[in-house]
Structures are given as C-alpha cells and as structure tokens.
Amino acid sequence: MNLERDNELRFESTSAPDGLYVVAKASNYMPHPEFPLPSIDLEGSSREEAYEIKCDGFSDSFTYGDIVAVSNNRKKVSGILSKNAKQNTLLVTERCDNLCSFCSQPPNNNPDTHLYVDAAYAIVNFNTDSMVGITGGEPLLNKRKFSTFMEILNKGGNTTPLHILTNGRAFSDSNFCSQVVELSSKRYILWGIPLHGHNQELHDKCVSMPGAFVETMQGLMNLSYTGQNIELRTVVTKDNYKNLKNISELVNSSFPFIFTHAIMNLEPKGWAKRNFDSLYVSVKEQMPHISECVFNNTLKGLESMLFNYPLCETPKNIQKYYCKSISDWKNYYPAFCNGCADKNDCGGFFSSSVGDYLNNIKLEVKV
C-alpha cells in the first residue's frame, strides 16, 4: 500500500537514546532556552546533545525542524511533528472516560502521563504558526496534566494554534472550564467536541457511557458561553444516521455560539473495525440524511464540514462542504481511483479501509 507520506522508518543504527529530537545540523542548531530537545541528523557530530542516525529514506521523510521520536527496541524513528505534513496531530493520552463503539484509538490504562510533557516540548521546539491537533484518549481526563501541558506552552513563549479533540465532559466542571480558558488566552484554540445523538439515550448508547450526554451538554454550555471556538463533531453510524437532522436541530436551538458542525465517516480501525458490521451504513445510504442535516445547518447559519468521505460519493450540491481530512501518513488511493479526474480534490481513503468497506464503495461507484 502506497501511503502519501512515510511517517515511520526502520533505521540501521543510531547514537541516540530513546526520546524526542529535533532534526537539525548540529553546527547551526540553537535549542530552546527553556525546554530544549537534542538534535539528530544523518551527519555525525562531536557536539554534546547532537546525535547521528543511519536510516534509508530519512532525508526524504523528514526535514530540518521536524520533531522525531527514536525507539531503539523497535529500531524505528517516527515523525511527531513534520513541516511536510498536511496536518500534525499529537496523542497526549490513551485513557478515556467514554467507550465509543466506533473508537479508532481504543483506550487502555498503560502509564502515559509523560505524553503530555512530550507533546508540550515537541510543540515548543517545532514552533509553527500552523494548527496542531491534540487528541487521545480524552486529553482533559487528567486535568492536572493537561494544565501542565498548557503551562509549558505558555512559559515557553509558544502561541501555536491548537485543535483539541475532547468529549467535553470535563468542562461540566465550571471551575476547570474557567481555568482552561485562562490558560488558553495566549493562543487560538478550536475545541472539537462530539455529539452523536439528539438525546441522552442515543448519545450514551454511541459512547457506551451512561450520563455522558448530560455532562457533554453541560460542558458545551459552559465552554460556549466563554466565547471559545467550538467545532461540533458527529460520527455517522447505523445508530444515528437517521437522526442527523435532529442533532442539527438540538445544536441550533441550544448553542447559538457554536458555528461549525463536522459530519464524519467511520475510520475502520480499532473498535470500529471490530464492530464494523453493526456500525457501518453505506455512504450511499448516509447521504440523503447528511444532505438534510447540511441544509438545515445552512438555514440556521451553522457551517457544515464533511470528513472522511470519498468525493465521488458526495452529492454535487453539498460538495462545497467537503474536506480533504485524512492525514497524509494514513491515507491512500486504491487502484480504482487511478484515472479519476477528481483525485487531486479527494481525500482518498484511510489505509485501514480494506475488505468489506472498500468492496462496498467499489459497488456504489460502479468501478
């Protein structure tokens, strides 16, 4: 499978211990004064905190200024933040207080609190004006560690805009909500918060957690009233696809300060792959309900965005809401996309989109 960009390479050897590094020539590398990371490059150096790596394809996949992670046990170097990436996203935890049946990154209880600090150091040293995504798990589940993450960014003089994916439940605590808003004052943040149902029964079923709907709704209210930027997100499944318009009605009647609704196709990975047969509804069946939701959003002044769909199955009258949303390190174009005139405008498919999912799409587009 040919991915758009290789984000993980196997190396021959390296002098670097496990950890994060800035790809840079040792001779002209200036580490951050408060939160420095060592440098790594194909060329050797006698300079302390400058390391060498022997790795085919390293220069093709990574460029100066990128942040990479070295794992000697796996003999792998992985891109953490890349200047060549269409989107950069950092995982800060694998723990979550929801158990979504369609989760592509199933939660676990492995020790991972170091990821918050690693992410903060990576962002400070990468120092980009482009938006960086923060995801989990649930990034706000460990409130203390999330606050530390934000404090490091602020102390490091960093103002990188962030797109933080959270289930929003932590914001039901109004004191914590106020604390986060204060910590966020030096940067633009877009909070991506999911609402998968128009009532408690449906949303709680989708996330497999009784009481989640009430906390998410309260969190949305608390956060929206502070003037923070919120992108509402709905993953479409067999359980909720016929209620997309109802979700739109709830958002428009309850949250006048939310202006964006992202409607998302499944990523067939993790629990979504395990539960595929009970979750997946064909794109062809989804689209009439998506169109209805989009038109209702438009009437109410709510912007719609369509994520993770093939362009060829998106009706012409709603293609202006289409987004090339799949990260370049996990997207590809199957053979039946070859020769398609719209390929450059299409986001393609997740690399996990194989088997029944892909066969279904092939039948629908009649390739």
Predicted features along the sequence, with ranges:
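Flexible mid-to-C-terminal extensions adjoining Fe-S/redox cofactors in radical SAM and related proteins
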Residues: 3-7, 315-367
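N-terminal [4Fe-4S]-dependent radical SAM core
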Residues: 34-36, 40-89, 320-324
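Canonical Radical SAM [4Fe-4S] cluster-binding loop centered on the CxxxCxxC motif
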Residues: 80-117, 343
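Core AdoMet radical
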Residues: 103-115, 126-142, 156-173, 183-217, ...
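Conserved C-terminal portion of the radical SAM core fold
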Residues: 132, 188-191, 214-277, 282-309
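Distinct, well-ordered alpha-helical segments
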Residues: 144-151, 172-182, 242-251
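Short, electropositive alpha-helical surface patch
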Residues: 151-154, 242-259, 315-331
